[in-house]
């Protein structure tokens, strides 16, 4: 049936047209297209051409042109002129795949208005940012238009109820409003319930709807307890100044009337970004900090970065744990301010330069500052003819430094380095060689590093390295073996760096600069021998590994670092042993044994054991005999009782001094919408001016709304 006048098309197996009443009846499944705007699927439809009303008592589906779907379970009455639908029960799936249901409702398709009872909104799972959520909003009645949606007597939660008796939290409100103009969710006269128990009452609060990426408003508040500082409440407020600027105010209030006002400012420019963090604490004496970073570009090939760090009290950062509240703080004991430039002159040439100021907060005022103005790094790769079978690089580095009030150093170091390509023999031996010519220049006054006031030296090193990669395939595994030989010749003089704390291990044994110095080379002639063995299973996973190496010298050299044993004719035997016994147990052992295997100077043992939901790892590090006298043990243990219940334990202890640096025991209950934990933590400081901090903390996060953190005893008392 086609009605050109009213722009209606009806398709059905059987239809009756009553010419007297001007009505069309369908008596089977029916498809109807209205004004090229709506597609209607139903059965037994009545179309009254006089009143322009479509009605049916059967289940009916309507789809519009913007991917919204309407299902009327108990039929409908559709006024096609006003585009108003009345129905006893409506289901809607919008273009964002959210589901809505109403009873005894009226729906105005033209003005996007809804009025109904017993409303239920079943949001798509990731609507609030977590695909494990099952967000839902229910109410007794709804009135909605293009500007606002109001739902009365509502219950809202994002919690997943799968395999649970109840949702983790619910928000019961007298009135819920979605302000579509301001893009706000607003709640009036609300009770916040946790596991069906009323926790606190909120007369009013709001938060941005999920379409908002940046909007001014309060961020997650949190409450924290500390044995040193007492309890504190932080209520951060985010202010979006513009699309490129924002400001976050993070006031921290203590129960003893102390406070810290901390703020963060960010701004994005066309070719740069600025971030600044600063705070003020006024108790006895005013303490504050100011940290800022500006980084950007000049054109396509030049990067720059400016960093400024300042505090007015040396222990302020540690005492108040400022680092926890900003990403700008890397160290609580050393401040670093600098201006740096990095320029790519061409594809083979690069220049970096920096002016720096270091401030060591653990030292007296007169000796705490170190100035570097500037340091630089210039590198150039020089393309050679193919006949040279290698590449050439020129590297120039240097700095000018003043430290500890009256100590001065200026250094320029020039490296001319040739590295050959690999040579592979018919039997598979892979060899390469390198030549280094180093020109070192320094001027110093009262230096603790350089003895000579004026020093100009030339150093040279020749390295030849050969290795033979071998592979053997077995029925259940594959073995790899690689013997390594390195010849080193450095006929020029060196410097006395015997007191350096440098230590060699297998990972740097064959490195050209294994002593870790840019101002000299390793003097003398040596042969370095070693091998790497690895066993892999059929999945190409490593199950066993052993690496060993040793350095042979033609004579002693007391100027080289004692810990490296490169000052002897034979170094320590250094290596690594890795063994994965099974999927549950993994061992990793790094060692440095005396050349005669009489004793061990260094041991680092890492053991990781996991069984089902239990995993623990131990890291034991000891230095003995020639390397000193230290012994540290660390442990991290995690027991996953279930997907939502976890126990964690961390500890670090100095066994020689019987000094526990840190330990923490925590229990966590975490779901898709709720995190609750008890945490006992104690932190010790070797700095005598700081008192150990001990806290028993209860933490609860209502995701995505709020966080409460406090001393556990105060939670129980109240």
For every predicted segment, state its role:
Residues 1-337, 447-448, 626-628, 643, ...:
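Structural signature for solvent-exposed beta-strand/loop edge elements and short helix-capping sites
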Residues 290-317, 331-357, 370-378, 383-390:
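Recognizes the extracellular SEMA beta-propeller fold with strongest preference
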Residues 181-218, 304-306, 357-407:
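Carboxylate/His-rich catalytic cores and anion/metal-binding grooves
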Residues 253, 329, 366, 454, ...:
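Conserved aromatic-histidine-acidic binding/catalytic patches
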Residues 103, 113-115, 138-139, 143, ...:
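Outer-membrane beta-barrel translocator/pore domains, especially the C-terminal barrels
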Residues 193, 220, 238, 277, ...:
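Residues in well-ordered beta-strands of folded domains
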Residues 154, 190, 222, 240, ...:
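Structured loops at beta-to-helix junctions and adjacent beta-edge loops in soluble globular domains
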């Amino acid at each position: 049936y086609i009605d050109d006048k009213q722009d209606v098309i009806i398709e059905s197996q059987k239809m009756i047209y009553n010419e007297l009443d001007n009505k069309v009846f369908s008596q089977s499944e029916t498809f109807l297209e209205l004004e090229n705007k709506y597609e209607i699927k139903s059965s037994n439809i009545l179309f009254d051409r006089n009143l322009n009303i479509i009605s049916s008592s059967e289940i009916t589906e309507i789809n519009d042109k913007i991917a919204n779907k309407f299902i009327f379970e108990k039929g409908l009455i559709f006024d096609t002129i006003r585009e108003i639908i009345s129905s006893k029960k409506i289901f809607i799936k919008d273009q964002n795949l959210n589901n809505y249901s109403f009873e005894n409702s009226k729906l105005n398709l033209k003005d996007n208005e809804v009025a109904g009872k017993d409303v239920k909104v079943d949001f798509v799972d990731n609507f609030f940012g977590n695909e494990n959520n099952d967000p839902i909003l229910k109410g007794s009645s709804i009135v909605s238009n293009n500007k606002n949606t109001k739902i009365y007597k509502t219950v809202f939660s994002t919690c997943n109820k799968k395999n649970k008796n109840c949702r983790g939290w619910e928000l019961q409100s007298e009135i819920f409003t979605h302000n579509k103009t301001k893009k706000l969710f607003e709640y009036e006269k609300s009770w916040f319930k946790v596991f069906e128990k009323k926790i606190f009452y909120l007369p009013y609060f709001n938060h941005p709807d999920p379409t908002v990426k940046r909007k001014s408003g309060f961020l997650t508040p949190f409450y924290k307890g500390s044995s040193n500082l007492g309890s504190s409440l932080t209520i951060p407020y985010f202010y979006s100044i513009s699309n490129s600027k924002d400001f976050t105010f993070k006031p921290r209030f203590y129960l003893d009337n102390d406070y810290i006002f901390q703020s963060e400012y960010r701004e994005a420019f066309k070719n740069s970004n600025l971030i600044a963090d600063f705070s003020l604490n006024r108790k006895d004496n005013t303490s504050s900090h100011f940290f800022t970073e500006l980084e950007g570009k000049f054109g396509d090939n030049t990067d720059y970065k400016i960093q400024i760090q300042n505090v007015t009290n040396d222990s302020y950062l540690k005492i108040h744990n400022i680092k926890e509240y900003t990403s700008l703080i890397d160290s609580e004991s050393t401040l670093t301010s600098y201006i740096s430039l990095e320029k790519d002159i061409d594809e083979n040439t690069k220049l970096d330069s920096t002016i720096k100021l270091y401030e060591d907060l653990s030292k007296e005022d007169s000796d705490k500052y170190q100035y570097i103005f500037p340091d630089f790094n210039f590198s150039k790769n020089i393309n050679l003819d193919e006949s040279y079978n290698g590449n050439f690089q020129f590297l120039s580095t240097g700095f000018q430094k003043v430290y500890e009030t009256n100590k001065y150093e200026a250094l320029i170091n020039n490296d001319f380095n040739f590295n050959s390509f690999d040579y592979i023999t018919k039997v598979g031996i892979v060899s390469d060689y390198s030549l280094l010519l180093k020109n070192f220049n320094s001027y110093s006054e009262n230096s603790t590093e350089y003895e000579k006031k004026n020093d100009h030296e030339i150093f040279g090193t020749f390295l030849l390295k050969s290795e033979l990669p071998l592979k053997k395939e077995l029925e259940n595994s594959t073995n790899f073996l690689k013997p390594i030989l390195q010849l080193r010749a450095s006929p020029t003089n060196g410097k006395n760096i015997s007191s350096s704390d440098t230590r060699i291990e297998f990972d740097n044994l064959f490195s050209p600069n294994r002593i870790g110095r840019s101002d000299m080379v390793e003097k003398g002639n040596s042969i370095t021998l070693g091998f790497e063995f690895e066993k892999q299973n059929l999945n190409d996973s490593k199950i066993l590994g052993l690496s060993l190496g040793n350095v042979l010298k033609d004579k002693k050299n007391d100027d080289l670092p004692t810990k490296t044993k490169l000052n002897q004719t034979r170094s320590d035997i250094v290596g690594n042993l890795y063994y994965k016994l099974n999927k549950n147990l993994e061992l990793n052992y790094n060692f440095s044994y005396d050349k005669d295997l009489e004793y061990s100077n260094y041991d680092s043992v890492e053991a990781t054991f996991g069984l089902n939901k239990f995993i623990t790892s131990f890291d034991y590090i000891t230095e003995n005999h020639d390397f000193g006298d230290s012994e540290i043990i660390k442990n991290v243990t995690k027991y996953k009782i279930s997907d939502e219940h976890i126990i964690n334990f961390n500890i670090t202890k100095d066994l020689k001094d019987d000094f526990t640096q840190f330990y923490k025991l925590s229990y966590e209950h975490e779901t898709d919408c709720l995190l609750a934990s008890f945490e006992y933590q104690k932190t010790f400081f070797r700095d005598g001016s700081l008192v150990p901090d001990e806290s028993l903390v209860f933490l609860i996060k209502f995701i995505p709304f709020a966080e409460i953190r406090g001393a556990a005893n105060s939670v129980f008392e109240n």
